[in-house]
Amino acid sequence: KKEYNYKNIVEETKTNPDKVPSGDIIRLDVNRTNFEKDKDINREKIINILNSLSICCPEINYSQGMNFIAAFLLNITGDEEEAFYLFLSLLLTSDYGSLFTKELSNLKKYFYVFERILDILLPELYNYLKVNNIKTSFFISPWFITLFTDTYLNIEHRENPKILMRIWDSFLFSGCKSILKVGISILKNFEPKIMSLNFEEILRFLISEIPKSEFFQNSSYENLMKTFINFKIESSLISNIESEYQIKKQIETKK
């Protein structure tokens, strides 16, 4: 907080809007997001937060979906400035910010790791998706970018979103690796359903219907915790696949 004066930064974004990286994209993204279920969400405050972050972290490219995180933090804190500092800390002190630098190299790494874990732990589902020409990057990208905060608008008890807060606790402790585990748990939970759908239905279900599903409601909390406990993904497996990915990239670079 000592290095950044939020009020001054916001004033700068309004006085010199041309200096805001991705300013036009941010405004467009926020304004077209459907917040109809929550009339209290202040779009201008969300835009202020995202524009300010864009100035403070020019090396991090804004990505569609970050607006959900800003809206989530704004709602749970009730304070625009506090939401800004929390999001700034998220970008600077966790591995989340690294997803959006250097040609999205880290995000691509997690796509690879996720697909390999899916192949190892849920081979039938993996093959079913492959037969239907569905790449995991089609649907897990929003999971990493929004950290599942796109589910927040559909949660009944937003004053105490148990599952989303549990996911964030895990993320703050383990970083983006926790999103791998949550994502695989989601696919495990919905595996029978997914394998009954065709190409278009699968994509619609994974991208649009899961965020609105009972999975993220407080009533599903106990079942979700059982899934997390019983369906473990060893950190050593993730590390081995990350090493595999780095070797693969080195070989490709030498070609």
Range-by-range predicted roles:
Residues 1-214:
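Internal, helix-rich recognition cores of eukaryotic regulatory domains
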Residues 134, 184-255:
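C-terminal regulatory/linker segments that are acidic, Ser/Thr- and Pro-rich
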